[in-house]
Amino acid sequence: MVTRKGVAGFTILLALCVIVFGAYVRLTDAGLGCPDWPGCYGFVTVPQTAEDYLSVEQNFPGEIVDEGKAWREMIHRYIASLLGFLILLMFLKDFFSYRNNDGSLKDLKFSSALLALVIF
């Protein structure tokens, strides 16, 4: 059984990881390693094959793919996305707990505020 404290604790730890890794991405000047979002040069991951690089040249003229920077940026995006999903999970857990009279309104308000921050 996944407890609220366990999810909240892991979410806090992951938020710290996103902050630290975001600083690393920024300090290594990898923030534009993947210029488009949510993918990377039109791909789910960093372009890897010769065909991928041809597609990048056609769709992003003048862009040079730096795999190291691109991977750092994509990993940061993946970690941040996981954080968003954990906040959504926390909200859903609090919502259904409150609905079944097992949870508190305070917990639901807190997770609702976090979810609103992520969405907006």
Where do the protein language model's features map onto the residues?
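Membrane-interface loop-to-helix entry segments
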Residues: 71-86
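Membrane-interface helix-boundary motifs at transmembrane edges
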Residues: 1-2, 96-108
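Membrane-interfacial loop-to-transmembrane alpha-helix junctions, especially the N-terminal start
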Residues: 6-8, 103-117
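Hydrophobic, aromatic-rich transmembrane alpha-helices
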Residues: 86-96
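Extracytosolic (periplasmic/ER-lumenal) interhelical loops and adjacent juxtamembrane/interface segments
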Residues: 27-74
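Aromatic-anchored segments of alpha-helical transmembrane domains
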Residues: 19-20, 118-120
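Short, motif-level signal for alpha-helix interfacial/capping segments enriched in acidic residues
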Residues: 3-4, 53-58, 102
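N-terminal signal-anchor transmembrane alpha helix
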Residues: 6-33, 38
